[in-house]
C-alpha cells in the first residue's frame, strides 16, 4: 500500500465536509473549548506565516475534540483596509471586487490544508451583514457616552489621506506607507477608552498573556500617581497647571516648559520678539508624532517665551519655555522642570544655560553630590527653604508637598494616564461608514438603528493617483434626510479605523448567523465563559488589537450584551517563519534573493546569507500551495509543528521538509505493518504496550500545555521508533499490534489528520476520528515501569558497547570477535539498594553516611574496604564533577535496582539480539568476580552500568 497524500487528503476533506463534523453549537453537557487565530487580511494567497498560525490552532482544536470538548473553531477575514483600496486604484476596479476575489483564493488554500473550521460561521468584516453591527455597536457606545466628536491634534498621513492612531505611527512614519506624519487639528470621532483605563491595567494581573505583552500594555496605559501644581504667570491672571509624579522635587524648579501646541503659548508670544522662533519650533513639532517626541528625541529644543511663572511654594519667578519634548496630550501639556533631578531637564538646562539646583540628597544628612548628571532616584529633601521639609524621604516627602499644595489651594493630587481616547475616524473609503448625519438645524444626529446598515456604494470609481476619500464626492451617499427634522442633510463621510472591526469579531463568531443582533447573549456567555480559551497571533498586535479588544469586551459587558470581562483566556504569540536572504554586513541590510550572486549594490562588498522573516519584498517566500502539491498537507503541517515550539521563530529548510516527508512515509509503512500483522504471539507485547501507555501520557501532557513540538516528537517520531524497535526485538502479536495502533493513530490525528483518518478506517473503525472521543487518562499497569526500565537498560548497554568498541579498535591490530560484559558484584547491588531507600527517606548522608557504611560487612573486609568506600562515594557523593548516582538515577533505575533485577540473567537471555545488534560473534555475560576480569573492568562495574571490554 503506497502512501498517496493527494488522494488521502482529498478523500477525507470531502468526508469531513459532507458529515459537517466540525460544526458546533451550545452544548451544556460538554466542556467548551474556543480556539481562535487572529483572522487574516485577505491579500491573496496564503503564506507560510498563515500556515504556521493555523496549523497550531487546528492541532489544538482537533486535540480538544478528541478529549471530548465541544470546540468552537471559526474562520473569517479582516477585509476592510487601505491595501484593497490601493489595489483597486491600480486596476481601475472596486475594493469590494478585489477583496472578494482574494477571499475566495485564501479560502481555497485554507480548505486544502484541511483546517477544521466551522465554515457556517465564516465572516468578512467588509460584508454589510457584519459592519451593520459595527455601526449598531457604535450607536450603543454613543448612548453610553463612550463616543465623542471633538477637534484635536491628530497624526495626519498625507499620502494615505487619513488620520492615524498613535499606535499606528512608527518612528514618526505611517505604519502603512512609511511616509512622514504631521500633526493637524481636525474634528474627529473618538472612543473614550480612558473610561476603562484602570480596569484595563488592573485586570492584566489575572489573565494568561505572555509577560512581555503585559508589560507593553502596562507601559501603554501608563498610570501615573502625582499632583497638578498651579504656577501663576507673572503679570497675568493666567495659570500654568503642571502635572508631576515627583512633587518632592518642587523646590528645585528652575524653569517651566510648555508643549508648543499648548494654548497659552500663542497668547504669550503673539506680537513679541520671540514669536518667530516659537513658530519655527511649533512647525517642526507638527511633523513629529507624540510617540517620537516622548521616546525618540535626541535633540531637545526649546524657545524662551519672554514670560515668567511663580513657584507656588517658594515664590521664585522662573522662565517659561516651549519645548519639543513636552506633548499636550500627556498630563497637562506643561512640565515643571527640575534639572537637578531629571536628566532630560538637565540636558535642556545645560544647553540653554539655565540654573541647576539640587534639592534631594542620596545620603541622609549630607549635601547632594556633584556628579555632572541629574540624580533621578528617591532621596532626602534638602535646600527647601521652608520648615518641615528638609530630611523627608521618598513617599513621605511627596505626600508632605501634596498636602501643603492642597492646603494652600495651589495644587491637587491626581492620577494621569499615558493611554488616550481612541481616535477612530479615517478619511478613507474602504471601512465601516460612521453612522451619523450632519444637519444644519439639528447638528450631528445618529442614524436610526432601523436604517442600518449605512452601506458603502458599489458604483465608486477608483483610478491610479486618486487621493482623498471618494465618499465625500459621492452625492448618492452624502445627500440624505435628517431623521429628526426631515430637511436635507449630509452623511458623515469618515469611516472607522479597521481595528474597530477586529475588536469584537470573536464575539460575533459565537453567533455568526444571527441577523437580529450582533450576537445572542446565551451563545456569547457559553462560548466566551472565561474568554477565548486559546488565542493565537503575532506579538505585533500586543498594544493595538489586543488592547482594543479588551476595551470592547468590557464596554459590551456594561452595555448588557454579555457577562464577559476579558476576551482571551490564553494568548500564544507564534514566532516568525524565516528563510535565508542575501545580507550585506557593511550596510547592515537584507536584500532581495535575486541579488544572491552579486555584490552589494550600495557598497560593493560580497554578500552573505542570514535568516530573515519571509516577505514579498525580500523574495524569500515559499509557496504553501507548491509544497502541498509536492508533499501533501500533512507533511507541511508536520514540518511547521515539529520545526519549533509555537512561540519560537523557525527557519524554512528544503531538506527539513523532505525529511518530514520521509518520516510520513515511515509512519505509513509502520501503520500498514501493524494493521497487516497476524502473528499469534510476540516477544515484545508487554514492552510495546507499556511504552504506548507511557508515550500517551507524555503526549497528552505536552499537547494540553501547547507543547506541540514535543508532542509531535512523541506521536510522529518516538512511536515509529518504538514500533521498529519491537519488530527488531522479536515482534508483537496481532492483539498487541491492534492495541498499539488504537493508541497511536489518534495521537497522529491533531497534527496530521488525513493519514490518521485513513489508517483508522483501514484498521476497521467505522467512526471517523473527527467524531471520536478517546480516553486521555492512560493508566500504567503495575509492571510497566520495570518492563520499560529493563528495555532501556538493554539499549544503554548496547550503546555503551558500541562506544567502547570504537576505543578498543584503535588499540587492536586485528578484528574484534567478542564482547565481555561484567555486571556489578552482589554487594554493590545491595548497597545501592540501601542507598536509594535511605535517600527516599531523606537520610542525611553528610552527617551519618560514613557511620552507616562502617556497619556493613563488606566494609570490614580489608580486601574490599577500599573498593567499598570508593563505590559508596560514587553513589552518594559523586566524583569528577558528576553527582552521586542516587541523585541522577531516575524512577525507572531506582525501581529496577530495588526490584532485585538480575542483570546477568537478562543480558544472557538477550545475548543473541545483542550479538546481532553489535554485529559480533560472541557475547559473554557474567558477574564481576565470577570470570576473567578482562581489561580490569570488574572494579569499575556499577549497578546498571556493567563493565564492558572487547577482544
What residue ranges belong to the model's regions?
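Catalytic alpha/beta core of large soluble enzyme barrels
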Residues: 57, 70, 262-363, 368-369, ...
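C-terminal low-complexity, glycine/proline- and small-hydrophobic-enriched intrinsically disordered tails
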Residues: 658, 767-951
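Non-catalytic terminal extensions that flank enzyme cores
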Residues: 1-48, 188, 200-201, 211-224, ...
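N-terminal catalytic cores of NTP/NDP-binding nucleotidyl/phosphoryl-transfer enzymes
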Residues: 25-93, 122-137, 244-245, 312-348, ...
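Residue patterns forming the tRNA-binding/recognition surfaces of aminoacyl-tRNA synthetases
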Residues: 2, 11, 15-19, 90-248, ...
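Amphipathic alpha-helical
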Residues: 8, 13, 193-223, 259-303, ...
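Alpha-helical recognition segments enriched in aromatics with Gly/Pro capping
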Residues: 307-330, 478-648
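Acidic, turn-prone loop/beta-hairpin segments
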Residues: 78, 436-440, 447, 453-454, ...
